[in-house]
């Protein structure tokens, strides 16, 4: 039999929700998870017995706030000292600690303190998306295209790629979220001629604006702008702060230090925010929120808009910047396309529509699924799919930030300008600053400011062994090379000796080493094995419980009650009670212990019921359904196993 063709999936790894899609038979399928939902919460929870990912993790967040981790995307590729990380830590119930300047999340798992890098948490979400795809496709999934905000910097892109590797995925490409959404928008509009499209992507935690021209399957990004720290979570934070103050005013109690109360309030605020997109008022009803006090209140859409007015208005600045960089007037934009759940907020839509002089906004694509849709198409293209729809599709993306190095006096010398089409390669010649200088120290930065101290340091390396010469004589050739993922490598070569040194930006800025990634891959396998062992344990426990109740139920059957001797009936009943009592006190026993208890019960029941049925049978449980069927059908009920 022919092996199934390998398929690659597209994964939208979101701040609050993630989504996976696959392109096959000429169309994209967005895949539902085991709960039937097409988006999965980007949540991971750790308990005394197991690890939960997705819906199961989010649904128990209020009961287990310290060990339920979310917002990993707001940590990934950042340093612990980053101002945004410090600000976010005030809102997170879980603990974030610093290890070698990198943030790690500290939780309690199976009674032990564990700490995880953001890449590891994200890899657990990616593994969940991988499992969702495998369940649908019925075959292993090894390849994926993963999306990131267009304004993610080099560190954040590489960290996302590492997360994919830890999840056991070959990451074919890291692509920008608004570009993926543009593919979703433009794929079925091929005959429309050249169109300028502005993608306005406001999600749970990040905000991007990209301007593209789309023509006959060529998607060319003209400019991109955004804020990697603006989204629905920030609107939730404003609501939470508002209601904490209201609670303090009304009840003279401060709930801000109680993690569980805050989690319950945040969940209610998120629900209220969604309600306000379709209604002008939302009510919150939270029983016994804090110290026995019930919290019943309401909020109007106008009040919500006023609380977030500065955040909503700030979304227009990147729109103006992207248009300026693309050298386009707003009148030249054919389609303004809304992507991301937060674009459902009426005030955001109104501000954007007014900015474009009343132009109708394009809401034709599903804002929650568009990014995964586009990623799935790009995955098919990279796997060489011959479908006519995607065969000629070409994606030309850009570098979101200028890249350069530090020269004398701390000046930023730019080699690659922002919005340069990628992949790209630029070379420039530099020289020494002093006589007989034995080496040069090359520091690589990204950003738009004139001085390097105001930009983001990506990495540094040294080119040594330069022959002694007066200042200005040696010629050092520096090459910046950005690949299609937007990841940078830098090479420096001394032209007189041919000596070279190269970095694909190193650990200086918080990137995981190859060894660390390999260790995390091994640990991810171990966690997966532990999860499977936990599932088997629960299945064995359920099987034992079901078996006991089957047996007890059979003893109550009128047709059997008089046929079983009283002594035997008491013997079976006593054993059932003994097993139930054991179960009550051994909720966390091993799979083997549950199976042993079940075998003991079967050994007592088998001779009693075999006399009754005229064959070796026990009503109920795994060993009895078939045997009961072999007996005389008129003597008793057929008992099936219930999983």
Curated annotation (Swiss-Prot):
Region (Disordered) residue spans: 617-643
Pfam families: HSP70 (PF00012)
Annotated binding of ATP, by residue: 14-17, 73, 204-206, 270-277, 341-344
Gene Ontology molecular functions: ATP binding; ATP-dependent protein folding chaperone
Region of interest: Substrate-binding domain (SBD): 396-511
Entry similarity comment: Belongs to the heat shock protein 70 family.
Disulfide bridge map: none
Alphabetically ordered keywords of this record: ATP-binding, Methylation, Nucleotide-binding, Stress response
Domain topic, free-text comment: The N-terminal nucleotide binding domain (NBD) (also known as the ATPase domain) is responsible for binding and hydrolyzing ATP. The C-terminal substrate-binding domain (SBD) (also known as peptide-binding domain) binds to the client/substrate proteins. The two domains are allosterically coupled so that, when ATP is bound to the NBD, the SBD binds relatively weakly to clients. When ADP is bound in the NBD, a conformational change enhances the affinity of the SBD for client proteins.
Organism whose genome encodes this protein: Saguinus oedipus (Cotton-top tamarin)
Domain of life, per lineage: Eukaryota
Location of N6,N6,N6-trimethyllysine modifications: 563
Region entry Nucleotide-binding domain (NBD), spans: 3-388
Its biological purpose: Molecular chaperone implicated in a wide variety of cellular processes, including protection of the proteome from stress, folding and transport of newly synthesized polypeptides, activation of proteolysis of misfolded proteins and the formation and dissociation of protein complexes. Plays a pivotal role in the protein quality control system, ensuring the correct folding of proteins, the re-folding of misfolded proteins and controlling the targeting of proteins for subsequent degradation. This is achieved through cycles of ATP binding, ATP hydrolysis and ADP release, mediated by co-chaperones.
Protein name: Heat shock 70 kDa protein 6
């Amino acid at each position: 039999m022919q092996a199934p063709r390998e398929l690659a999936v597209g994964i939208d790894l979101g701040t609050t929700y993630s989504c996976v899609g696959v392109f096959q038979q000429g169309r994209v399928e967005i895949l539902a998870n085991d709960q039937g939902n097409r988006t999965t919460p980007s949540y991971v929870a750790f308990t005394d017995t197991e690890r939960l990912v997705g819906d199961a993790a989010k649904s128990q967040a209020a009961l287990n706030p310290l060990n339920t981790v979310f917002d990993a995307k707001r940590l990934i590729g950042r340093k612990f000292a980053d101002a945004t990380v410090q600000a976010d830590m005030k809102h997170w119930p879980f603990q974030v600690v610093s290890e070698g300047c990198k943030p790690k999340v500290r939780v309690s798992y199976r009674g032990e303190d564990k700490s995880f890098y953001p890449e590891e948490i994200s890899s657990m979400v990616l593994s969940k998306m991988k499992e969702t795809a495998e369940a649908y496709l019925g075959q292993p999934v090894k390849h994926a295209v993963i999306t990131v905000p267009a304004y993610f910097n080099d560190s954040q892109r590489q960290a996302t790629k590492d997360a994919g590797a830890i999840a056991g995925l070959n990451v074919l490409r890291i692509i920008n979220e608004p570009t993926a959404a543009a593919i979703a928008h433009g794929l079925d509009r091929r005959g429309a001629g050249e169109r300028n499209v502005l993608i306005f992507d406001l999600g749970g935690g990040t905000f991007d604006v990209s301007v593209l021209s789309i023509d006959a399957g060529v998607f060319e990004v003209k400019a991109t702008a955004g804020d990697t720290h603006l989204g629905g979570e920030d609107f939730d934070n404003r609501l939470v702060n508002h209601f904490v103050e209201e609670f303090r005013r009304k009840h003279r109690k401060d709930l801000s230090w109680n993690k569980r109360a805050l989690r319950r309030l945040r969940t209610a605020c998120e629900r209220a925010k969604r309600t306000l997109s379709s209604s002008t008022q939302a009510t919150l009803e939270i029983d016994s929120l804090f110290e026995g006090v019930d919290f019943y209140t309401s909020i109007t859409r106008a009040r919500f808009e006023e609380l977030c007015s500065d955040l909503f208005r700030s979304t227009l600045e990147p729109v103006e910047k992207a248009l300026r960089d693309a050298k386009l007037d707003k009148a030249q934009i054919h389609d303004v396309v809304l992507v991301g759940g937060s674009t459902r907020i009426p005030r955001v839509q109104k501000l954007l529509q007014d900015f474009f002089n009343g132009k109708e906004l394009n809401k034709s694509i599903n804002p929650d699924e568009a990014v995964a849709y586009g990623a799935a198409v790009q995955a098919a293209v990279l796997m060489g799919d011959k479908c006519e729809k995607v065969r000629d599709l070409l994606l030309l993306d850009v570098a979101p930030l200028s890249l350069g190095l530090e020269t004398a006096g701390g000046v930023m010398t730019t080699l690659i300008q922002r919005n340069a089409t990628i992949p790209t390669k630029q070379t420039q010649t530099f020289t020494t600053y002093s006589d007989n200088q034995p080496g040069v120290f090359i520091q690589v930065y990204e950003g738009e400011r004139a001085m390097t101290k105001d930009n983001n340091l990506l990495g540094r390396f040294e080119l040594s062994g330069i022959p002694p010469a007066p200042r200005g004589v040696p010629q050092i050739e520096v090459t910046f090379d950005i690949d299609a993922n937007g990841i940078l490598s830098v090479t420096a070569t001394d032209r007189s000796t041919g000596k070279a040194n190269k970095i694909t930006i190193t650990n200086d800025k918080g990137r995981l080493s190859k060894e660390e990634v390999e260790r995390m891959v091994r640990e991810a396998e171990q966690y997966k094995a532990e999860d499977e062992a936990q599932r088997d344990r629960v299945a064995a426990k359920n099987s034992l419980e079901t078996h006991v109740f089957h047996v007890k139920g059979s003893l109550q059957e009128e047709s059997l009650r008089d046929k079983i001797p009283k002594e035997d009936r008491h013997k079976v009943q006593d054993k059932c009670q003994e097993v139930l009592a054991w179960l009550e006190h051994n909720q966390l026993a091993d799979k083997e212990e549950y199976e042993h208890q079940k075998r003991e019960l079967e050994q007592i029941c088998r001779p009693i019921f075999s006399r009754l049925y005229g064959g070796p049978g026990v009503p109920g449980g795994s060993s009895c359904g078939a045997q009961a069927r072999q007996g005389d059908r008129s003597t008793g009920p057929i008992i099936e196993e219930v999983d």
